[in-house]
Amino acid sequence: MPNAPPADPLAWRPLRAPSLEEMEVVAGEIFRRLPANFRAMCEDLVIQVDDFPTEEVLDLLGIESEFDLLGFFQGVGLPFRSESAAVQMPNMIWLYRRPILDYWAEHEEALGAIIVHVLVHEIGHHFGLSDEDMEAIEAQQSDQDGKR
């Protein structure tokens, strides 16, 4: 039975949630595995991992619980960019480690699959993609991972 808990309860000790740094590495690797044409459109996009969203972000979105937001796109999406606009901060995607881990603990999805979903969804906001487009990218990613 491969999913059975270890016979020794102390065997759980080395199991732990990924740190901020480890989750950044995972997010970077997931990004590198996304379809090349999709990644090519993400020039100058910064991916940042933090434990929780800031109070300002929660207030902006009208969200009460810091656990209700897994990721956030901050910047000007490509459909809304203007050549005449003043120089701005780079577009960023924030992944929120603790809410992602909480979601992971409550669902039967792999942590990597959750991060793929959040990352693709937030990048989708950057490009103004439809939900169907984002689902197709996730499916393509899943197919590629299945071939590895």
Residue spans for each PLM region:
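Catalytic glutamate of the conserved HExxH
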Residues: V118, E122-H126
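Active-site rim/adjacent substrate-binding subdomains
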Residues: M1-I114, H126, S130-A136, Q141-G146
